[in-house]
């Protein structure tokens, strides 16, 4: 699962213009160009009951080429930046194309990718003043929504492997901050955590990791 998350999120982050360090190789040309004659995954929109927010919330789910309900899959929860929603990665990137290409090249183990809306409030659209206190607070509230509402829904609806070793979380900007905070704060739930150009903590460091090793 570690290599899966690193390869995928690095490719997606590169697509968004995240600057790579010299020790990290650049993605090869055409990594996000749609190719003909290869198997494609499926994207669907789901709606889940959020007891945290008190409403139904939307997320996008990518299932890999050859998806079968008789198999079990690891899951990556991929979070967007502060100005986006569950559609953000598709509006400004091509995650489904990148995934399909990586599968065609034999570089990924089949997995499910969940793209949620990380702004856990009733009016969760990225409209108006996205820096308003209530909208920013929604990104911290999403931790409870993710753990108590979204993950249980995904694990009830899709054939996934229900252990920390098969559960990853990663994101860009605000989503990167959420990934670090939620992932490091819940290491019993997530074995793999990735943050890219991550926003500041939603929690104080001593609360986030009270017993650093």
Spans of model-derived segments:
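Positively charged n-region of N-terminal signal peptides that target proteins for export
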Residues: 1-5
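Bacterial N-terminal signal peptides
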Residues: 7-15
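Sec/Tat signal peptide C-region and signal peptidase I cleavage site
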Residues: 16-20
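Non-catalytic cap/lid and distal C-terminal segments of serine-dependent acyl enzymes
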Residues: 21-213
